[in-house]
Structures are given as C-alpha cells and as structure tokens.
Amino acid sequence: MKSIADTGFIVAFARSNDQHHLWALDLGKRITEPLLTCEAVLAEAAFHLGSSSYVLSLVEDGLLRLAFDFSENLGQLRELARRYADHKPDLADLCLIRMSELHPRHAVITVDEADFRVYRRNKRETIPLICPPQGN
C-alpha cells in the first residue's frame, strides 16, 4: 500500500484511547512498505503525543520515511498557502498536498477528511484518501 501519513493517523496509531485507534492499528497491520511523510507531520505528532522519542522510533523502525524537501518546494508551498488561505491550512497539510502532487500513486492516510476533501493537487485533482469509516 503506497501511502502518505498525516499527523492524525500517527497519533491514532500510538494512542490506545484515540477514537480512531483500532482503525489505525488495523491499517498498520496491512502496511507493507514505509509510509511517506514530512518533518512538519512528525513535529505535530511529537507535540500531540508528548514524545519525540516515539515518533523518532517510527522512522528508525521503518514504518515512516521522510520524503519531502521543504526548501525545494517552498514556492509551491507558498502558492498552496495563498490558494487555501480561507481554510487556514497548517504547514503539515500544505506539505502533504505537495507530497501528493509529487507522489501521485500514493493516498494520504488521514483522520482529517473534511479538509482534505477541499484540497486539490495540481489545482483540480482530488487527493486520494484513506480515512476511518464515518461514525468511527
């Protein structure tokens, strides 16, 4: 499964009391290759979990792989920030939108379906998503 990991998935995977924990665990069992992500997502996840060490271990253990160069994509990130200014996307979301453009065969794993249904890659393409079932 070729995918890009958002913060909410990582937090749900780690926290047994998260409403999406069982979904994240089930999905995690089916992952056969590292999930791509970016530093902004790792920083958010470490903040929400209160543990940089746990997030670092996910990278060290090969569940997550950093696959984004912020500096090389600064112009595109700035354009995305302008395009979605009314939605006030955080930096991690902007990076994930751009990663989806760079890795078009990858779906974004997120619990934040509402925002990602609004965002578009390459200006008009919907971003393929893997989300928890409705009501979960």
List the model feature ranges, each with a label.
Residues 4-5, 23-51, 62-69:
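PIN/NYN-family metal-dependent endoribonuclease catalytic core
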Residues 1-18:
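Metal-dependent nucleic-acid phosphoesterase active-site entry motif
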Residues 67-113:
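Active-site neighborhoods of divalent-metal-dependent phosphate/nucleic-acid chemistry enzymes
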Residues 8-9, 40, 114:
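Alpha-helix/helix-capping structural signal
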Residues 104-136:
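Acidic, PIN/NYN-like endoribonuclease modules and their adjacent C-terminal/linker elements
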Residues 12-14, 57-58, 119:
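Residues that scaffold the ATP/ADP-binding catalytic core of kinase and kinase-like folds
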